[in-house]
Amino acid sequence: MITVRTIPELRAAIAAHPGTGRPGKGRPAFVPTMGNLHDGHIALVRQARPLGDVLVASIFVNRLQFLPYEDFDSYPRTWEADCAKLEAAGCDIVFAPRESDLYPEPQTFKLQPDPQLADILEGHFRPGFFTGVCTVVMKLFSAVFFASGGGTAVFGKKDYQQLMVIRRMVQQFALPVEVVAGETARADDGLALSSRNGYLSTAERAQAVQLSAALRALAQAAQAPGAPPLAALEQQALQTLAQQGWAPDYLTVRQRHDLQPPAAGAAAGTLVALGAARLGSTRLIDNLEF
């Protein structure tokens, strides 16, 4: 495994990789991360391994997707541990640009995603978040896939809305990138693995599973014969979580394909329950397809 910092170094490393010398081959598989890797990230890397001829993972904490009061400065940087995990998972190239490598000048040209998809849920509570995500992902896609003419990128379902936004971006710009979804990795008690779980106190960690439990309960209630309107079920779920000591932003059921409220009688297998809530000072998100 090798590490590169700049876009020219990355493109040269991809071109020089032994896998790119075979006829008809040379397409990268790519997993973007912000570092502080856990088993969920590594599962995505292992999933990506057979999907390309050279496996690239990026580590870059993207300032553009943090709000001024969020944890950009305190976000854990665990470089040596991350590299060891990536190498063990079969990664070929780690792209770890400095901020000056990816943003050599002020990023005044940014991507504005579809507001119907990006200004709801996470986008409502974190305005500008998906502009930052789309801008950096477009830059990373350009860096990784430009020379090869395309490839595969793996994103986790844990960040469900982000996955939908990236897929829409790829579709709208006709990018030669296949976006593959990875299942959410969970702890034994059901808590979705997240880099921010490390912020939880011991007591909060024991309580954190309540978020995934609330989503399961909401999904089950929504599917029950003669169920009340979704708005009433969502309000009840919010109240229950608040009574347990959380500060919820949203608990809601949406259509998977566009994250809009479902039509009456929506078929099973087309919906997703999504939630975001703060436990103490830590904001967690999760989702459940059903």
Swiss-Prot record:
(R)-pantoate binds at Q65, Q162. It is an enzyme of class 6 (ligase). InterPro entries: Pantoate_ligase, Pantoate_ligase_C, Rossmann-like_a/b/a_fold. ATP binds at residues 34-41, 156-159, 185, 193-196. One of its GO terms (biological process) is pantothenate biosynthetic process. GO terms for cellular component: cytosol. Beta-alanine binds at Q65. Keywords: ATP-binding, Cytoplasm, Ligase, Nucleotide-binding, Pantothenate biosynthesis. The active site is at H41 (proton donor). One of its GO terms (molecular function) is pantoate-beta-alanine ligase activity. It is found in: Cytoplasm. It catalyses: (R)-pantoate + beta-alanine + ATP = (R)-pantothenate + AMP + diphosphate + H(+). Its EC number is 6.3.2.1. Pathway: Cofactor biosynthesis; (R)-pantothenate biosynthesis; (R)-pantothenate from (R)-pantoate and beta-alanine: step 1/1. It comes from the Bacteria. Belongs to the pantothenate synthetase family. Homodimer. The reaction proceeds by a bi uni uni bi ping pong mechanism. Catalyzes the condensation of pantoate with beta-alanine in an ATP-dependent reaction via a pantoyl-adenylate intermediate. This is Pantothenate synthetase.
